[in-house]
Structures are given as structure tokens and as C-alpha cells.
Swiss-Prot record:
Gene that encodes the chain: bshC
GO terms for MF: ligase activity
Pfam families assigned to the protein according to its UniProt record, in alphabetical order: CC_BshC, Rossmann-like_BshC
Protein name: Putative cysteine ligase BshC
Coiled-coil annotated residue ranges, if any: 460-483
Keyword Coiled coil: yes
Enzyme class: ligase
Similarity comment: family membership: Belongs to the BshC family.
Source organism (scientific name): Bacillus mycoides (strain KBAB4) (Bacillus weihenstephanensis)
Record's function text: Involved in bacillithiol (BSH) biosynthesis. May catalyze the last step of the pathway, the addition of cysteine to glucosamine malate (GlcN-Mal) to generate BSH.
């Protein structure tokens, strides 16, 4: 493997944040300097955490996942008040979801190691699985290449319900068939059998989306020391009850904090991402096997527009009695993460960084400082065939990341023709239409009754010219088919569906191509935190 860093233009909040603009940096409580991390350590030492109870739960959960010894050691280290975490989170996507999930984990492993060395304290990596999420459409699919097209392949659960990913059981046999269909789209390699077995072993131990995800990640990062936490685990929720009750008691202040911070961002020219009703409580409650967002109405807490109604006292009692029925929304999830873990740093993608910028005053309302927010590493893998296509097309490695590949293709094609087709046909149409307009005027003078026919005649001539243009372009493309296919392959490999590779493709393709130790070899690379994009040549 060879790693190359390239500067890719950033957009929105993350661009201003990484470019050091003070206005947006003021929406966060810490800069990304070594002094700021030292200040964060000082601030965390002023707080208390339920470390022993947390360690007991994490040991039980990760042991069930058959986590490696290094992970167990890291969990036990959390008993020590001088141990901190670098944390990131994601939904439990099938087959681990898009590549960026793996890249988030690589990011927390790298940053935890670096900060442990530079700060002289124990720093352990934690990955927060968003098990409370109930939007199955975001996690029930992956993308593959089939018949020279990119296809979204969905796992259709035969018993769908609006439950959380931690509670949504699926048919192992149905999922196994879905996995086999995915792998049929991959080339057969020396690694295919082992990777299929690797996936099937994880699937065989699973009952839910979160189970499958957690077993795969545990096996994939077996020797890394990674700690997993399911945010919707009943045992964890039990530990969270005091803070859940605090959220309910402070929901108005939380909402005001959110609105005020969003106004700050609007004044800076940014459109807020988080959309909530003014009476939102920011807590979900499971009612009749569905996850329902609570709202306040005339002193009552209601769900489904008043179909369900609870008093404040009833909610408090139910939280004590059945804490597993409650979960956080997008606003309170970061707060709960801050309550549970002594967080040295949170790692997020561009979208997360943008929405966290809306939460500063929400954190303050809860009595917290927002942890340092570090943009995750961004990575693209470039296979040898892709590099060869770039060379054959006389393109630089950076070109597909700075330019639309369709535009690169069109520019290349136009350079193969002496005179631009589009321009020549535009001129021809104008010349012919000018002649025809004059002709129509002549016809109208002699026989006005033919005026409508003359207009139709003009349309037919125009259609024939457009048909000729279309056929010419098709023949030109056919003549250069070999080279144009290289542009298509570049698009599929580096910018599938016009998006970054890591937002579309799944890690299993690369495990199948390069072996089960692929992720381990990626983690051996040296990455920088300067916001540059990392291209790894395979």
C-alpha cells in the first residue's frame, strides 16, 4: 500500500472549521490544539463518572461478542480515573454499511493512540453503535456493480416494524441468501471463501441488526483494542436513568439552547440541519412496539399527536420501572454520550460536525462542555487497474477528486474531434432555421393556408437534424468505446453515483479482493489530521 494526501475543497461548516475561521470555531468549546486537549483533561478531572458500573456492563457486552484480550484490558483501564476515551458512532449498517464506518473506527484508533502518547494518559477507543435508531431504510442495503450499473441491493425483512435496530430481529436464512447475492457480484478470488465464512460466522451468532454489525466489527478489529457499546442495550439504559430524567426536567431549556445556537449559525450564513417542533422533548418512548417521539402539550407529555399522554410523574416512574423503553434523539444522543463516557475527543463526519455546531448551548444547558470535535479521516482506495486507467487517459491522480468525471470524459472526447459537434450543429440549426423562416414568409404570402403545414415542416427538419447529431455522437462514442469505458470504470471506482467512494462502497468488496487482513494493513498507514484526503494505492 502507498498513501498519498491530496487537498480536496471542503464545503459548509467543516470548511470554515478546518480553515480556522474564528466565527465557526467559537461554536465549539475547544480548538484542536495540544493545549486544548490538555485543558479538556483538566475539565474532565473536575467531573465524576460511574466508571465501575460502566466497566461491568462493557465487559459483559464485549465478552459476549468474543472481543480480544486488548479490548478487555482497555475496558478494565476505564476503572482508573486517569483513563479517557476517543469516541465515534454510527448506525448498524448491514455488512458494516458504507466504508466511512470503517474509516471512523480507524480514526478513533489512530487518535486514541496518538493522544495517549502525547498527553501521557491512558486513552481508549470506543465505538458507539446507534442501536436505538429505527430507520431501517438507512441500514438495510448495500451497493454493488451489476450489469455495468450501480445497484442498490436491499435486504427485505419479511417482518418489518418500527422498532430499534437493537430490537429488530431478522431471518438469518434470508440474510444469508442476501449476503450470497452480494458476493455473486464480486469477482471470485483466493479470498472469497474465507470472507464469506467470516461473514457467515458473524451472522450465525446474530439475531438483530446490531448483533450482526457488532460481531462483524469485533472480528474485523479483533486485535485493535476497540471497545463497542450498544446505545440501546437495556443494561446501559439502566445506568442512564438519572440523566434521562434530567433531560425531561430540562427539556424547555434544551429547546431554547438549540434555537439560540441555531440563530447564531444563521447569522453566520449557515442553514441549520436539526429540525424539531418547538414543543419537542427530545426523548423517544417505546409504545406498542413502536418508537414514538414525545412532545409537551399543556403540561402533559404526549405521543402520536395526543394518542398517548403521560404526566411528568408518570414518565419519571416509568423511566425507573422500564428504562429500556426510552431513548435519545439527535439532540440528546451527544449529551448522553458525554454523560456516560469521559470523552477526550469525539470524531465525526462532515455532517455530524455541522449538526454538532448547533448543540453548543444545549451542552451548556446540561452542564457540560462540548468535547473537542475532530473530523474523521477521509480515505479513497485506488486499485491498480484504476491507476492504469488514469495513466492511459493522461489524467493525474488528483483529477477525479477535483473535477466531475463526466466533465473530464466530455472534455477528453471533444479533444478527439477536430471541430466540436455541439457548436457545429447549433450553427447549422440556426442557418437552416433562418432559411426556413424566410421560406415560411414566402409561402404565407402565396398561400396562407399552408402556414400551419410550414410550421410542422420546420419541426420535422429540426427533428431530423437532432437525430443526425445523436447518431453522429453515438458513432463517435462507439469509435472511442475502449477509452470511454475507462472513464466509466473511474466513476464507479472513485466517485460512484457522483459521491465519494467511502459513502457508497462496502468493505466486503475490498476484503474479497485483498484478504481478511485488509483493514489491518490500512491501519498500519500513517495518516494526518490536517483535513486532507487520503488516497491509498493498492
Amino acid at each position: 500500500m502507498e498513501i498519498k494526501e491530496i487537498s480536496v475543497p471542503l464545503q459548509g461548516v467543516v470548511a470554515d472549521y478546518m480553515n480556522g475561521k474564528k466565527e465557526i470555531q467559537s461554536c465549539f468549546d475547544y480548538l484542536l490544539t495540544e493545549d486544548a486537549f490538555k485543558q479538556r483533561l483538566h475539565d474532565l478531572r473536575e467531573r465524576e463518572f460511574f466508571r465501575q458500573d460502566l466497566v461491568t456492563h462493557l465487559l459483559e457486552y464485549n465478552t459476549q461478542l468474543q472481543a480480544g484480550e486488548f479490548t478487555i484490558q482497555n475496558i478494565k483501564a476505564l476503572e482508573d480515573e486517569n483513563t479517557y476515551v476517543v469516541i465515534a458512532g454510527q448506525q448498524a449498517g448491514l455488512l458494516t454499511g458504507p466504508l466511512y464506518t470503517v474509516h471512523k473506527i480507524i480514526s478513533i484508533l489512530q487518535l486514541a493512540k496518538e493522544k495517549e502518547e502525547s498527553l501521557g494518559v491512558r486513552v481508549v477507543p470506543v465505538f458507539w453503535i446507534a442501536g436505538e435508531d429505527h430507520d431501517m431504510d438507512e441500514i438495510n442495503h448495500t451497493f454493488v456493480t451489476k450489469n455495468k450499473k450501480i445497484k442498490k441491493t436491499i435486504f427485505h425483512d419479511r417482518y418489518p416494524k418500527k422498532a430499534s435496530a437493537s430490537e429488530s430481529e431478522f431471518s438469518i436464512e434470508d440474510c444469508r441468501k442476501w449476503v450470497e447475492e452480494i458476493f455473486k457480484t464480486y469477482p471470485e478470488t483466493n479470498f472469497t471463501k474465507d470472507v464469506l465464512q467470516f461473514v457467515d460466522d458473524a451472522l450465525g451468532k446474530s439475531h438483530t441488526y446490531v448483533d450482526f454489525f457488532a460481531h462483524l466489527i469485533t472480528k474485523m478489529f479483533a486485535n485493535s483494542g476497540l471497545i463497542l457499546v450498544d446505545s440501546h442495550h437495556p443494561a446501559l439504559r439502566k445506568l442512564e436513568v438519572p440523566f434521562l430524567q434530567q433531560i425531561i426536567s430540562k427539556y424547555k431549556e434544551i429547546q431554547v439552547g438549540l434555537r439560540n445556537q441555531q440563530e447564531v449559525l444563521k447569522e453566520l450564513g449557515f442553514k441549520p440541519i436539526i429540525e424539531t417542533k418547538t414543543n419537542a422533548v427530545h426523548i423517544f418512548m417505546e409504545i406498542d412496539n413502536e418508537r414514538v417521539l414525545l412532545e409537551e402539550n399543556q403540561g402533559k407529555f404526549i405521543g402520536k399527536d395526543g394518542v398517548h399522554s403521560f404526566s411528568y410523574e408518570e414518565l419519571m416512574e416509568e423511566m425507573e420501572r422500564s428504562p429500556e423503553r426510552f431513548s435519545n434523539n439527535v439532540v440528546t444522543r451527544p449529551l448522553m454520550q458525554e454523560y456516560v463516557f469521559p470523552t477526550l475527543a469525539f470524531i465525526g463526519g462532515p455532517g455530524e460536525l455541522a449538526y454538532w455546531s448547533e448543540l453548543q448551548q444545549v451542552f451548556h444547558t446540561a452542564g457540560f462542555q462540548m468535547p473537542p470535535v475532530v473530523p474523521r479521516l477521509t480515505i479513497t482506495y485506488m486499485e491498480r487497474d484504476t491507476a492504469t486507467d488514469l495513466y492511459d487517459l493522461d489524467l493525474q491522480e488528483i483529477d477525479p477528486f477535483l473535477n466531475n468525471i463526466d466533465n473530464l470524459r466530455d472534455n477528453w472526447l471533444s479533444n478527439q474531434i477536430e471541430e466540436p459537434i455541439d457548436e457545429r450543429f447549433i450553427e447549422a440549426k440556426k442557418e437552416i432555421m433562418d432559411i426556413h423562416t424566410s421560406l415560411q414568409q414566402f409561402v404565407k404570402k402565396i398561400d396562407p393556408g399552408l402556414n400551419e403545414f410550414a410550421g410542422k415542416n420546420e419541426l420535422k427538419i429540426n427533428e431530423q437534424i437532432e437525430l443526425l447529431e445523436k447518431m453522429l455522437k453515438r458513432n463517435v462514442e462507439k469509435k472511442h468505446e475502449v477509452q470511454l469505458n475507462k472513464f466509466r470504470r473511474l466513476q464507479f471506482a472513485l466517485r460512484p453515483l457522483g459521491a465519494p467512494q467511502e459513502r457508497v462502497w462496502n468493505v466486503c468488496y475490498y476484503l474479497n479482493q485483498f484478504g481478511l487482513d485488509f483493514v489491518d494493513r490500512v491501519m498500519e498507514q500513517s495518516f494526518s489530521w490536517d483535513g486532507k484526503h487520503h488516497v491509498i494505492k493498492l
